[in-house]
Amino acid sequence: MKRAVVVFSGGQDSTTCLVQALQQYDEVHCVTFDYGQRHRAEIDVARELALKLGAVAHKVLDVTLLNELAVSSLTRDNIPVPDYQPDAEGIPNTFVPGRNILFLTLTAIYAYQVKAEAIITGVCETDFSGYPDCRDEFVKALHHAVSLGMAKDIRFETPLMWLNKAETWALADFWGQLDLVRQETLTCYNGIKGDGCGQCAACNLRANGLNQYLGDKVGVMAVMKQKTGLAQA
């Protein structure tokens, strides 16, 4: 039996990963993390979507210690979430230091226990928003460390790594779930479901990608299929 675990936030990217995983694996588990995030409504959204889409198990892990250690606008109510700034440079204040290190490591422990062969995460280097822990180099390095530490090679799959947001929308559409991802996921840093607040960086990235996809569905779909190997599907 092919078994995978999805790092699942209930946002656009991880939901698209879950939708695809359910087509490619016999059994799919989801792991969601409660770290006291400002947009913690995503946890309820994740629960709803995992149940609706058919994950066999959904584990919500309490990692509120991360909130105590990592200072970010996503972990502190007194630090405002910045509006979208297309020319911004450097690491944004929405970056939560160590988040993906912790999430992937804990998910690997869970995957080890349920005998899963793969961990799937929606990180993306193409539209990575300046987050260093969304880079391919980081994921490969952590995978190497985890494999050594567990003496077991649990694959780290990153199906969105080289897709832009328009192509990620195309992937959701390919699997017949564009409307669900658009209406029922929560990507917004301010915790607003669907199209979100329209002001934060996450909402702008999501909206711009959707508009680009809807403006050239055939072209974007073709590029996505080539990048993902779905061209033969």
Swiss-Prot record:
Molecular function GO labels: ATP binding; ligase activity, forming carbon-nitrogen bonds; zinc ion binding
Tell me, which GO biological process terms does this entry list?
A: queuosine biosynthetic process
Cofactor binding mode and count: Binds 1 zinc ion per subunit.
* Binding positions (ATP): F8, S9, G10, G11, Q12, D13, S14, T15, T16, C17, L18
Q: Which cofactor does it need?
A: Zn(2+)
Q: According to the UniProt entry, what is the EC number of this protein?
A: 6.3.4.20
Give me the reactions it catalyses: 7-carboxy-7-deazaguanine + NH4(+) + ATP = 7-cyano-7-deazaguanine + ADP + phosphate + H2O + H(+)
- Keyword Nucleotide-binding attributed: yes
Keyword Transferase carried by entry:
no
Q: Which UniProt keywords apply?
A: ATP-binding, Ligase, Metal-binding, Nucleotide-binding, Queuosine biosynthesis, Zinc
Task: Report which residue ranges the record marks as coiled coil.
Answer: none
Pathways involved: Purine metabolism; 7-cyano-7-deazaguanine biosynthesis
Gene3D superfamilies in alphabetical order: HUPs
Q: Which residues does Zn(2+) bind?
A: C188, C197, C200, C203
Q: Which Pfam families match?
A: QueC (PF06508)
Recorded hits in HAMAP family, A to Z, give: QueC (MF_01633)
The record's similarity note reads: Belongs to the QueC family.
* Function statement: Catalyzes the ATP-dependent conversion of 7-carboxy-7-deazaguanine (CDG) to 7-cyano-7-deazaguanine (preQ(0)).
Spell out the protein name for this chain.
7-cyano-7-deazaguanine synthase
- Tell me the organism: Klebsiella pneumoniae (strain 342)
